[in-house]
């Protein structure tokens, strides 16, 4: 599967005879159910964008790519059933669907585009099927999905992008896969976590990754983490302890509030950091 950034390839496929276009979609503009005929395997950019009448989509059994903003600002009420042929959902494909409540991605999905479900304010459940090919949750993917409360991540996930779950305030508990290596800038900004267990292999927590997660009480930093970004746990008002047994290569400023105690080894780089930042510490 070629990259979602391969614009040249997609510009050619958009004119393929197997591509369902916005012109074809306009013939269904007054229908509540949009059914993509079987002969079409690509859905063009902006195909149904802004069509508030359509409540349900039936994809063709061989569908492979869903284009940019293809179903943006529709009001889908029924979950979209993705066939096991779907490889890519492009940027903003389902953004601003305020009635969509759940989504299950097929194991075949490799690429999920930036902003693809941004602003889906009724979305409660997101799940990736077992053995999912998806390795990355992209930038702003579920940004402002304010009712999102359950996420089942891909088994082989490597990274969570910038603001992927920004302001998902009902997201109180997640299980991150062991394969995860990086959590991006403000990825879980103002989420509702009460606990968080970071996987052992994780290497980077970018700036403000968990900023404002006010109900967090205690976090252990695994020893493979080499980068702790600025204000990574700042604004976590209930956070009592941040435990760091090793010395990351980079520790940004203000990683926690002043009322939080950092548990670390005496004489360590983290110990010196606490002294410089005026943070409380407790030796382990």
Question: Model segments located where?
Answer:
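A short, structured beta-strand/loop element
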Residues: 20-22
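Structural signature of tandem-repeat unit edges
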Residues: 1-18, 28-42, 52-65, 75-88, ...
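A structural signal for leucine-rich repeat
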Residues: 118, 130, 143, 211, ...
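Short secondary-structure boundary/capping segments
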Residues: 25-26, 253-254
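Short polybasic/polar patches that bind polyanions
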Residues: 72, 189, 275
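Consensus positions within tandem repeat domains that build extended binding/scaffold surfaces
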Residues: 24, 45-47, 67-70, 91-93, ...
């Amino acid at each position: 599967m070629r990259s979602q950034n391969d614009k040249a390839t997609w510009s050619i496929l958009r004119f393929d005879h197997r591509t369902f276009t916005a012109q074809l979609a306009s013939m269904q503009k007054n229908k509540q159910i949009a059914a993509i005929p079987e002969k079409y395997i690509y859905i063009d950019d902006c195909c149904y964008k802004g069509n508030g009448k359509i409540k349900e989509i039936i994809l063709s059994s061989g569908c492979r790519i869903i284009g940019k903003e293809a179903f943006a600002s529709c009001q889908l009420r029924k979950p979209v059933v993705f066939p096991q042929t779907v490889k890519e959902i492009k940027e903003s494909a389902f953004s601003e669907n305020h009635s969509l409540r759940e989504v299950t991605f097929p194991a075949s999905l490799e690429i999920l585009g930036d902003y693809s479900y941004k602003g889906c304010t009724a979305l409660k459940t997101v799940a990736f099927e077992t053995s999912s090919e998806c390795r990355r949750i992209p930038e702003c993917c579920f940004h402002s999905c304010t009712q999102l409360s359950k996420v089942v991540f891909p088994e082989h996930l490597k990274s969570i992008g910038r603001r992927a779950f920004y302001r998902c305030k009902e997201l109180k508990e997640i299980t991150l896969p062991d394969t995860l290596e990086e959590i991006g800038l403000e990825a879980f900004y103002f989420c509702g976590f009460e606990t968080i267990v970071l996987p052992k292999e994780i290497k980077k927590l970018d700036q403000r990754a968990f900023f404002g997660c006010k109900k967090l009480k205690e976090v252990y930093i695994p020893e493979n983490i080499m980068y702790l970004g600025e204000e990574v746990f700042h604004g976590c008002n209930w956070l009592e302890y941040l435990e760091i047994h090793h010395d990351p290569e980079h520790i940004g400023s203000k990683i926690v509030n002043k009322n939080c105690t950092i548990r670390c080894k005496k004489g360590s780089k983290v110990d010196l950091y606490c002294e410089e930042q005026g943070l409380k510490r407790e030796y382990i």
